[in-house]
Amino acid sequence: MATKSKRTLAIRAMVDRNNRYAIEEALELVKKMATTKFDESVDVAVGLGIDPRKSDQVVRGAVVLPHGTGKQMRVAVFATADKATEAREAGADIVGMEDLAELVKAGQMDFDVVIATPDAMRVVGTLGPVLGPRGLMPNPKVGTVTADVRTAVINAKGGQVRYRADKGGIVHSTIGKSSFEVKALQENLLVLIDSLRKAKPATSKGIYIRKVNLSPTMGPGVAVDLSGLG
């Protein structure tokens, strides 16, 4: 316990809470703070100028990061016939319909993403109470309800992140692993920020991107100087 406390104190001492760091400097600091034995994720929290209580200010979307997330994603697809074949050929880990639904109901959900063809939603719709709380329910707004299952599977396997602003107007995501080069993390971050800007609600007024904090899985946040976001 004492060792953990010393580590925590040492890491916190690296960060000047009153400073806003340039992107590269912030990422270098995050990598330096990732001192655990596993390859920590580099997480980002983006504070948006929205009112999440208003239905017309919901920010939700998905974007493929150019350098991926560093995580191997397992993908399940609800589809039949040719679409099921497309999904398998694209690399889906599990493909089915009623049989897959039975696995979900039994709690056997060894996957990170669920994709469904529009006609499969008659089956998937009944699984809302199970998939919804786990953030696995397919949704057309993030491209997981689609007839183009091939592209959806390739994107999910290739580093796509899905995001949604929480009740505080903050979007939480990951932009890679601490083992990534700073340049790769920076490019991933800028692609995510660009996607968030494109998702800006028309009714959002004032400053939209209000704050950006970066952190390793087991470390404190580092505030980013917004002027470097382009």
UniProtKB/Swiss-Prot annotation:
Key word Ribosomal protein present: yes
GO molecular function: rRNA binding; structural constituent of ribosome; tRNA binding
Family annotation (PROSITE patterns): RIBOSOMAL_L1 (PS01199)
A Gene Ontology BP annotation from the UniProt entry: translation
Top-level taxon: Bacteria
UniProt keyword tRNA-binding present: yes
Protein name per Swiss-Prot or TrEMBL: Large ribosomal subunit protein uL1
Native source organism of the sequence: Acidithiobacillus ferrooxidans (strain ATCC 23270 / DSM 14882 / CIP 104768 / NCIMB 8455) (Ferrobacillus ferrooxidans (strain ATCC 23270))
